[in-house]
Amino acid sequence: MHHTVHVKDLRFSYPDGHAALNGVTLSIEPCEKVALVGPNGAGKSTLMLHLNGILHGQGEVKICGWSLENGNLGRVRAAVGLVFQDPDDQLFSPTVFEDVAFGPLHMGVPEAEVRERVAHALEAVGMGAYADRVSHHLSMGEKKRIAIATVLSMEPEILVLDEPSAGLDPRARRGLINLLRALPQTMLISTHDLPLVRELFPRTVVMDQGRIVADGPTQSILNDVPLLEAHGLEKM
């Protein structure tokens, strides 16, 4: 069986010369739930943008056994449900239905199946009654749910979420936690919300300065006060 995510010795520098990834190696198994933590500028978001080919560095990236080369980019992007930190970066259509339908329609899914996928995705995030609403009139918590629905409609193998709890009030945050707990997909999340990590993610990976500096059971990582302090993370 293939790893859902396999990254080996991944290196990437931005045009200004900043080295954002310095030899990252990471594997994630099917159905595994993994949290990615570290200070701002550690390379977490840069790593995530490599998983569906938005960025291309040096090294090896495979999703469900598919390399990002050799014409596989379309199937890789369908397999990786990338949810940005700011849902307004993901929601651009006149209605919620059109936002959630955009991906499958773009991939050539028949219209009848698209409607079924949209209905299923909206129900999965608790937004079944919102299909005709205007996305930009929703609250931040509602927008984040719709953004997740836009990738669920692609029937991804893995959800990759960048700071999903950022900007949420306590009630919306709790609703998000309950939603993430219920989703069956393999999951990789980047976050500063360590209580969320402790509650939902059995494995935690710590990044700093473009490298993985720790990888192990969440309870062990989050109880290691010297490790947290050394890499700009608040002890719990």
Language model features by range: what are they?
Residues 134-138, 142:
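Conserved ABC ATPase signature
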Residues 52:
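Helix-to-loop junction immediately C-terminal to a conserved catalytic motif
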Residues 197-199:
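A short, surface-exposed alpha-helical micro-motif characterized by mixed small hydrophobic
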Residues 112-130:
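Conserved ABC ATPase "signature" region
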Residues 191-192:
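H-loop/switch region of ABC-family ATPase nucleotide-binding domains
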Residues 59-68, 76:
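Conserved ABC transporter NBD signature motif
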